[in-house]
Amino acid sequence: MLTLYSFRAMTHQGLGEFEQLVLLAIVHLRGESYGIPIVEEIERRTGRQVARAAVYVTLRRLEEKGYVSSWIGDPTPERGGKGRRYVEIESAGRRALRESRQLADRMWGELDPASLRSR
């Protein structure tokens, strides 16, 4: 039987909801993944306002977990000669997303819809 503890051990570290949203935005963006487009993608798809700082902190944490990798692009004049930090999802990040989805699907699949109705 898969428990939350064994799930986290299996994935090395569990994914929080916001980490999932950031990873999914990176997948949707297909190559143009850096801070601002990730923020915009999450806002567009969820209707939530997202702080840039929250995305940058999450990207750093996802990189530490080995779920994304990053590199600095070419310098641009509009950034004062600095390059953007691009990110891409790694196979471990894709696997963590799949496992997270499978766990949620199992939890939802076993839930009686009546238990969510207001009393």
Predicted regions and their residues:
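Short, contiguous hydrophobic alpha-helices characteristic of membrane insertion segments
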Residues: 11, 67, 118-119
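Alpha-helical DNA-recognition elements
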Residues: 61
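Short, intrinsically disordered or compositionally biased N-terminal tails of bacterial proteins
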Residues: 1-12
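Conserved beta-strand segments that form the floor/walls of ligand-binding pockets within enzyme
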Residues: 88
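Exposed loop/turn and edge beta-strand positions of beta-sandwich/beta-sheet ligand-binding modules
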Residues: 83
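N-terminal helix-turn-helix DNA-binding core of bacterial DNA-binding proteins
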Residues: 12-56
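Amphipathic alpha-helical dimerization/coiled-coil segments
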Residues: 92-119
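Beta-hairpin "wing" of winged helix-turn-helix
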Residues: 65-80
